[in-house]
Amino acid sequence: SGLQFAVLDGQGFIPFPRV
């Protein structure tokens, strides 16, 4: 949509555009 969703990765939080 335009919002960003943060996911917990091995190195930390990686924000990616949620569609």
Swiss-Prot record:
Describe the function of this protein: Mediates visceral muscle contractile activity (myotropic activity).
Family membership? Belongs to the periviscerokinin family.
- Tell me yes or no: is Secreted among this UniProt entry's keywords: yes
May I have one GO cellular component term?
extracellular region
Q: Which organism is it from?
A: Striatophasma naukluftense
What are the Valine amide sites (modified residues) in this protein?
19
Q: Which domain of life is it from?
A: Eukaryota
Query: Could you tell me the keywords of this UniProt record?
Result: Amidation, Neuropeptide, Secreted
Q: What is this protein called?
A: CAPA-Periviscerokinin-2
GO annotations under biological process?
Answer: neuropeptide signaling pathway
Location within or outside the cell:
Secreted
